[in-house]
């Protein structure tokens, strides 16, 4: 898009430019294997595999669906995108939503984080409760 994109504000659960030590390590490893930056599909796959691994560990290797679901409820961990919890009621992800603005950093246009909202639950399910 070029400089016309400067100032555009977006909202997402992930951008490879998110500033954290864990994300920097994730981006470096991802680039080494795939020769490109990760996106929200990449981080979703990474976190999904983390959840499966942790649930299997918690069940002692039991692969029964009910045991794995019970193990996943309420699970929390630090992801490259930030803190994540699995809602014990809905089993949905509770996560930070980041607001980014396109800025020129050196000679690159990057999404620079300008704000965030922590512990965001599925807004539709939250409204349906009331």
Residue spans of the language-model regions?
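Extracytosolic ligand-binding ectodomains
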Residues: 1-130
């Amino acid at each position: 898009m070029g400089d016309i994109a400067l100032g555009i504000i977006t909202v997402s659960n992930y951008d490879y430019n998110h500033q954290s030590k864990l994300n920097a390590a994730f981006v470096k490893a991802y680039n080494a294997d795939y020769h490109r930056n990760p996106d929200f599909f990449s981080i979703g796959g990474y976190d999904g595999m983390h959840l499966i691994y942790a649930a299997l560990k918690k069940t002692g290797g039991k692969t029964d669906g009910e045991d794995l679901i019970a193990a996943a409820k309420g699970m929390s961990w630090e992801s490259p995108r930030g803190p994540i919890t699995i809602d014990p009621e809905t089993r949905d992800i509770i996560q930070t939503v980041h607001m980014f603005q396109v800025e020129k950093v050196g000679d690159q246009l990057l999404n620079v984080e300008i704000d965030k909202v922590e512990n965001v639950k599925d807004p539709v399910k939250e409204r349906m409760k009331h």
